[in-house]
Amino acid sequence: MLNNPFCYTPAPSIVEAARALAARIDATPSLRALFAEGKMLGVLEVERSLSSSDVRLAPEKRSLRRTPPAASLASEKAQRRMASGCEGFFSPEQTDDRASGARPSMFLYAFSGLAGGSAFVEGFVPPIYAYKPDSIRATSPEHSRQLQDWLFDQYIVVNGRGERRSIRQIFADRGLVPPGGTGECAAPKLLQYALLHGLTPVAIGEFWYGASPEREVRRSGAFYPACTGKCGPLLAYMLEGLDVEPNPLESDAHWQLADPVVRYEDRDLIVAEKPAGMLAVPGRPVPGVAPRRSLQDWLADYCGAPVLACHRLDMDTSGLMVFAKSPEAQAALQEQFEKREVSKAYLAWVSDPSGKASLPEPGTRGKIVLPLAPDWYDRPRQQVDPDQGKPAVTDYEVLRLRDDGAAFVRLIPYTGRTHQLRVHCAHKDGLGLPIIGDRLYGGAPAPRLMLHAAHLSFRHPADGRRMTFASSQSFD
């Protein structure tokens, strides 16, 4: 069963293939020059389900009569490379388990976008569709939109049932318009090539190679889930008909959730500890997916009446939350959060998965000031944005170190931006050490995100007295 590209722990075979690819790039000056500035690379393990001469779903021939005057297709040589057989795109470390009766596994490699201005690099699968970017010149915003529409009509992809559809149609079926660059990520390139050549996908992973970008949190060697904006609708279509693991984030069963713990309750409010993996408040309905139970739902049942949210906590994060029992109490508590009169502190385990970074000594304190903004094409990820980002400030203190290269830290946010602590820990201009278990920002694999809301202090909405709650977390 193929792992879900939107939430996964990379298979050992994928990790080894990625390391082999990175080593090959490091040892090849021409490749190192192409990728040194930073690039998302993809690895797909496949089984040859058909003989090399029995290729199904061969790429369609496009008619140049459909090409607008301002655009042209790639060269005939490039087109032949797109329609060529499988040779040249497999890792030399192929596995052959004929003695055990298993089919041999092979690895396909791809990169996102262009490398050195080219869509073709020897040893990597070709793009879904090729054109010469320099030949496409938009003369007006309307012309630009028409060219974009035309291009996405040419991007014909296949799914596991052998069906074909253009990228524009796939997004239109969902009431969406494909963002620029859709179809150029590594994962859709890999799946397209495999499905066109009778190969069965076994495992997939995307990892970053090279320098970290200024805005996004990307660490060389770290694996990341497929993006949601460009690849969400596209991969959902391409994976139809394949045996794919369900997204564990869409099911409470994955988390084996413990019940929340109520820490305090009176007629105005209730304070509880949320377990990791539970939604703080109900999420948006997803067609075909059963709604997940949130802490707000659980507390409503516990109290026998609705409770009202006053703040948020990431699904992956555990710890203290306060809910109001009346609109008046909710307004008073929310005002404290908005005026930053609520005191909060978190505990986290952080590390450098590569093992190359030196850890700060216990007792080290510091302040991280990095403005944050949404990554619009990969929600819910956030990125550092000095131009449009909102101010975000976090104090940190290193409490102790572990022999395995992890550090236990206290984090005190003075602003409440989405994923603030996760980005401030992981970004190269922040702590530079992602939180362990952070699947979005390159943390070392773990059963859960090692982040816990351990301290919460506010004034009671009715009588104004200061209320302070503390919670320890072993992260067992």
Annotate each language-model stretch with its function:
Residues 1-476:
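RNA pseudouridine synthases
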